[in-house]
A protein has these predicted regions:
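Residue-level signal for cytosolic alpha-helical hairpin/rod architecture
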Residues: 59, 169-170
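Alpha-helical support elements that line or immediately flank enzyme active sites
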Residues: 1-13, 17-18, 113-122, 170-184, ...
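The feature captures the catalytic groove of carbohydrate-active enzymes
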Residues: 1-88, 110-115, 212-213
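Extended amphipathic alpha-helical segments enriched in small hydrophobics
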Residues: 45-68, 164, 175-192, 221
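Extended glycan-interaction surfaces of carbohydrate-active proteins
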Residues: 21-36, 82-166, 187-221
């Protein structure tokens, strides 16, 4: 909805009421743990990516009021947005390792952290994002492509050895490009495009050793 407004799309009778209804739910439930973007098995946790997404929900609602003149409790939403950000910085940031973590209290990283700049949580070249990308590269790059997270940590009960998840590598391309690493972005983008099948589609994962697509086809994340 926010993207549509910025492109000049007109509000209809349902767009803002729908967003207000969604904000009511988010306001009442944002502090609850969940299973994260990857629907990880096991106990629910406070995933950093999930917290950033609710931060983004409040940020978009605030902007809808202040930039587009819609009616809503922007000051209250701003207080909650700031509270969420404080929690992320206190519990989702590992100062010793210099990286945001997969979930609060975790020592691992997650490729979904690459979406933090995409929703405006911080700039792509922010020092915290740059060091988080470095941690992601160290821990999740496998044959030059990104894993979602390390399954060998036992966080979800899956066996080690998951193939790289292609959408995550495209997120890395965007991060490289938006933070000024254009050469790295071009190299990785060209490699990813080379994996497309005869009708130009990509699967969920890629088996580098077997040089084949694996998982759900097409990938539509």
């Amino acid at each position: 909805l926010q993207a549509a407004r910025r492109l000049g799309a007109a509000e209809d009778d349902f767009s803002w009421p729908l967003q207000r209804a969604l904000m009511t739910y988010v306001e009442e439930n944002w502090m609850r743990p969940d299973n994260g973007i990857w629907e990880i098995r096991g106990p629910q946790r406070h995933f950093t990516h999930s917290r950033v997404m609710v931060w983004a929900a409040f940020d978009c609602a605030i902007r809808a009021v202040r930039e587009f003149g819609l009616e809503g409790p922007a000051e209250r939403w701003q207080e909650i947005r700031d509270e969420i950000r404080d929690e992320i910085e206190q519990r989702g940031w590992d100062a010793e390792r210099g990286t945001y973590t997969q979930y609060f209290g975790s020592e691992g990283v997650d490729a979904s952290l690459l979406q933090l700049p995409q929703v405006g949580y911080l700039a792509p070249d922010d020092p915290r994002m740059v060091s988080t990308v470095e941690a992601i590269e160290r821990e999740l790059l496998h044959d030059g492509l990104l894993l979602r997270y390390r399954t060998d940590t036992g966080v979800d009960g899956l066996p080690a050895g998951e193939h790289p998840f292609l959408a995550c590598s495209f997120w890395l391309v965007e991060q490289y490009a938006s933070s000024g690493r254009m050469d790295d972005a071009r190299v990785l983008m060209d490699r990813l495009v080379s994996f497309t099948n005869d009708v130009g589609l990509l699967s969920e994962e890629y088996d580098v050793a077997g040089d084949r697509q694996v998982g759900n086809v097409p990938q539509a994340l």
